[in-house]
């Protein structure tokens, strides 16, 4: 699709969203067509909710999030097939795999084992492995990534190339508030089992999160080497584990409760990261 066509599509979506109280299941014409086209483009990976720029910053295409939100107003509840044992669900968003056969799966080039759930408008690139997991609408999962058992990729989340999302990992979805950016895991990251990255936080390229690390916008990320405290972004090629910081004392002077934080225990270069096992990196 040309840039002119995308601009026209964006204009229709923006106008419809500004007047969304009038959008419902009876709405026809260019609004419905524009929303459906936007979701198809997301589903195919031809557009994405966020794109990394040359300077390393991420540009968020808010109009695509608006298209996803409008789809909830346009679509009625319906039977969704494909459950275990021929069971069904009741929802407004069909499966990405609805009406897929062998040819479609071979062309897509990824593996989806039984009980992997992907909602329509999520993009899954070639050589991705989806264990029994959940990928929500508008998400983008890039080439060579492993989405392990019971991992969740939230709505509009952006997952880079060759990422490993370990068992039970949660990558938060961000549709609202609209001004918030999606949660982003850049290329070559390792996210340890049962960890959570949410609220539009960014894990930069090559970073390693140990098991059970929780990062939201208000989580203190402490660099052990410098004492610097940051929020919302894990630096590239950093190794992060769960930790605590001393809390404020009680009014009587006794020590207060310690508070959770994420701790950067070391930073490595790209060469070291590529040659060193994850467990070895986390031992320190």
From Swiss-Prot:
Q: Can you state which reaction this protein catalyses?
A: (S)-2,3,4,5-tetrahydrodipicolinate + succinyl-CoA + H2O = (S)-2-succinylamino-6-oxoheptanedioate + CoA
Q: What InterPro entries does the record tag this protein with?
A: DapD_Trfase_Hexpep_rpt_fam, Hexapep, Hexapep_transf_CS, THP_succinylTrfase_dom1, THP_succinylTrfase_N_sf, Trans_hexapeptide_repeat, Trimer_LpxA-like_sf
Keyword annotations: Acyltransferase, Amino-acid biosynthesis, Cytoplasm, Diaminopimelate biosynthesis, Lysine biosynthesis, Repeat, Transferase
Family to which this protein belongs: Belongs to the transferase hexapeptide repeat family.
Q: Which cysteine pairs are covalently linked by disulfides here?
A: none
> What SUPFAM superfamilies is this protein classified in?
Trimeric LpxA-like enzymes (SSF51161)
Q: Where in the cell is it found?
A: Cytoplasm
Q: What assembly does the database describe for this protein?
A: Homotrimer.
Record bears the keyword Magnesium = no
Q: What name is this protein filed under?
A: 2,3,4,5-tetrahydropyridine-2,6-dicarboxylate N-succinyltransferase
Which enzyme type, at the first EC level?
A: transferase
Record pathway: Amino-acid biosynthesis; L-lysine biosynthesis via DAP pathway; LL-2,6-diaminopimelate from (S)-tetrahydrodipicolinate (succinylase route): step 1/3
Q: Which PROSITE patterns match?
A: HEXAPEP_TRANSFERASES
Q: Which GO terms describe its molecular function?
A: 2,3,4,5-tetrahydropyridine-2,6-dicarboxylate N-succinyltransferase activity
What organism, scientifically named, is this protein from?
Agrobacterium fabrum (strain C58 / ATCC 33970) (Agrobacterium tumefaciens (strain C58))
Among the GO biological process terms of this entry, one is: lysine biosynthetic process via diaminopimelate
Principal cellular location given in the protein's record: cytoplasm
Q: Which residues bind substrate?
A: 111, 148
Q: Spell out the CDD domains in the cross-references.
A: LbH_THP_succinylT
Gene Ontology cellular-component terms for this entry are: cytoplasm
């Amino acid at each position: 699709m040309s840039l002119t066509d995308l601009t026209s599509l964006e204009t229709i979506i923006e106008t419809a969203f500004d007047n969304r109280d009038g959008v419902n299941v009876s709405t026809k014409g260019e609004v419905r067509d524009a929303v459906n086209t936007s979701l198809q483009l997301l589903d195919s990976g031809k557009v994405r909710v966020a794109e990394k720029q040359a300077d390393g910053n991420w540009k968020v295409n808010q109009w695509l999030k608006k298209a996803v939100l409008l789809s909830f107003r346009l679509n009625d509840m319906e039977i969704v097939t494909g459950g275990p044992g021929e069971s069904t669900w009741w929802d407004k968003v069909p499966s990405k795999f609805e009406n897929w056969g062998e040819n479609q799966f071979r062309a897509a080039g990824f593996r989806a084992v039984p009980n992997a759930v992907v909602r329509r408008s999520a993009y899954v690139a070639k050589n991705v492995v989806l264990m029994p997991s959940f990928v929500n609408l508008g998400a983008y999962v890039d080439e060579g990534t492993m989405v392990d058992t019971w991992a969740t990729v939230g709505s509009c989340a952006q997952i880079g190339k060759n990422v490993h999302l370990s068992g039970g990992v949660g990558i938060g979805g961000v549709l609202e508030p609209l001004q918030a950016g999606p949660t982003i895991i850049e290329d070559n990251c390792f996210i340890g089992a049962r960890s959570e990255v949410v609220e539009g936080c960014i894990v930069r390229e090559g970073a390693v999160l140990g098991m059970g690390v929780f990062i939201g916008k208000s989580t203190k990320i402490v660099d052990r080497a410098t004492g610097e405290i940051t929020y919302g972004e894990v630096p590239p090629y950093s190794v992060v584990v769960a930790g605590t910081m001393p809390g404020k004392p009680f009014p009587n002077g006794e020590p207060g409760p310690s508070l959770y934080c994420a701790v950067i225990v070391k930073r490595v270069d790209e060469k070291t990261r590529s040659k060193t096992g994850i467990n070895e990196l986390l031992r320190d």
